[in-house]
């Protein structure tokens, strides 16, 4: 793995199927003058782990894939296979999920960029339904 795995992602465990780990790469306790810093965390997914469908409001999300193999899917579109070096730019308001392939660990760096005209600090995740085992297992043939 390219970056630290971090601690078990217990704070968000209810939004994941399987186990994930979170390693913040930028400090969280910034002063008001430093809030322009781009927040980044390394997220590690154990094999078969994925997050629920979700939507980012007030910000776009950028995923930089750094190790292993994963999946990214937008609602109503086919899943995209991810590998180290891939970058996914997710527009604000798009329903999506991402996670590891069934037989591979997967790491990505996640960051978000507030969209123009959003209220500072208004970015929020809307967590939705899990990706069903049936949906996920259909991807196994695409690996």
Describe each model-derived feature in a short phrase.
Residues 45-48, 82-103, 113:
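Conserved metal-binding segment of the jelly-roll/cupin
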